Amino acid sequence: MIKTRLLILITAIAGLFFYSCGYKFAGSGELPASVQKVTVLVLENKTAESGIENIITNDIIYEFTRHGKTVAKKDEADAFLYGTVETASDVAISRSSTITSLERRVVVVISLKLKSKDGNIIWTGSNISDDQAFTVLSDKLATENEMRKAIEILSKRLAEKVYNKLTDNF
């Protein structure tokens, strides 16, 4: 009985501590400048990787809707999220010889801005990056498919980073 009360008391104190210091999970805040409805524009692609801008844009839209934020049409939005895929590069991370790679890592860097309807920049996120390893296969087409899968995986993490940075009120 005493142990139960002590456990309840400790839990209550810990809860009050986290509540009082403003602790919250990443991405659980609100969008800046009281933005309620956002239009996510297709990112500009400055890389040689075709279609990467659509993959990342779709994942950002999904991340917003997953958290209950309204993704609106241009004429209904309070703000516009737009930006560029700056780089998409891959490097060898393990080799079987000086010429042959066994595994590579793709790194994608994006930069974004959130602009209000009246044209003011509300938020800027520069050089947001993520990476993902992929296996190099003997068939070039199969290796390209592995890289594409890696881009799809890291795109989801990039979208989470973008959302968390946008809703982080620190």
Predicted feature descriptions by range:
Residues 47-58, 101, 105, 141-157:
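Soluble non-cytosolic domains of exported or imported proteins
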Residues 67-68, 80-127, 131-144:
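Surface-exposed short loop/turn segments
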Residues 8-20:
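Bacterial N-terminal signal peptides
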Residues 1-8:
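Bacterial N-terminal signal peptides that target proteins for export
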Residues 2, 18-62, 66-69, 73, ...:
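A structural "domain/chain start" motif
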Residues 10, 29, 72, 99-101:
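Residues embedded in well-ordered secondary-structure elements
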Residues 129-170:
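A charged, solvent-exposed segment within the mature domains of Sec-exported extracytoplasmic proteins
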